[in-house]
């Protein structure tokens, strides 16, 4: 699916892609921007001391970008059981009990997908942190744009965790997932803001 088709489906009534797929896409673009900075830096005499590290980071950034794209598919697949669970009958006690059991499992699956995405986005932000230090100053603004996209995707993915855990009956599991999401939000946002400030110091007149 090309970008235009993706956006058309995203804007439609189709259940997927939704916010999760959008977050994965935005984060992948952000990581790709970071990788672009590396590509513009590699081979430059001025940054020769970092050449070996840059080559390693290009591979890592490419891997994270690919995995974020995979997260888009995983998020869509994770939402399907939840979508089906909402349609289960609940007219009798037995039906209601079955529906609640299926719903609880579906909510868990639907929460795990964005949580995994958040972990990967924080990896991307950490990588851009290093890129913003050793990357070409001529392309440093792109590292700033990339990290802002990753930050937005991280916060967006957290909402997809919380909206599902809020409905879970197993409070212990829900609280554990919320705690993990909270920590990722704090870690990712603090580092993203630090990177943004570093970039601003380089580009602002």
Positions of predicted regions on the chain:
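Amphipathic alpha-helical interface segments
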Residues: 75, 79-148, 152, 164
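Amphipathic alpha-helix face/heptad-repeat signature
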Residues: 25-29, 57, 64-71, 106, ...
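Short, hydrophobic/aliphatic alpha-helical segments
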Residues: 1-16
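Amphipathic, well-ordered alpha-helical segments in soluble domains
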Residues: 6, 29-36, 78, 117-127, ...
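Phosphate-handling active-site elements
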Residues: 33-53
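Preference for long, well-ordered alpha-helical segments
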Residues: 124-127, 139-198
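Conserved phosphate/anionic-ligand binding catalytic regions in large, soluble enzymes, centered on
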Residues: 12-33, 139-157
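A structural-propensity feature for long, helix-poor, extended segments
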Residues: 46-84, 184, 191
């Amino acid at each position: 699916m090309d970008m235009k088709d993706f956006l058309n489906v995203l804007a439609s009534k189709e259940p997927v892609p939704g916010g999760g797929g959008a977050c994965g896409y935005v984060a992948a673009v952000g990581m790709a921007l970071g990788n672009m900075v590396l590509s513009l830096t590699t081979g430059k005499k001025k940054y020769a001391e970092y050449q070996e590290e840059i080559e390693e980071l290009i591979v890592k950034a490419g891997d994270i970008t690919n995995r974020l794209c995979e997260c888009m598919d995983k998020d869509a697949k994770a939402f399907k059981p939840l979508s089906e669970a909402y349609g289960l009958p609940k007219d009798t006690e037995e039906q209601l009990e079955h529906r609640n059991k299926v719903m609880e499992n579906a909510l868990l699956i639907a929460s795990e997908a964005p949580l995994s995405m958040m972990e990967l986005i924080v990896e991307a932000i950490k990588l851009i942190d290093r890129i913003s230090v050793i990357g070409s100053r001529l392309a440093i603004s792109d590292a700033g744009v990339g990290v802002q996209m990753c930050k937005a995707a991280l916060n967006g993915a957290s909402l997809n965790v919380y909206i599902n855990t809020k409905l879970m009956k197993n409070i212990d599991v829900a609280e554990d997932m919320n705690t993990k999401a909270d920590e990722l939000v704090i870690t990712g946002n603090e580092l993203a803001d630090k990177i943004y400030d570093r970039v601003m110091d380089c580009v602002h007149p």
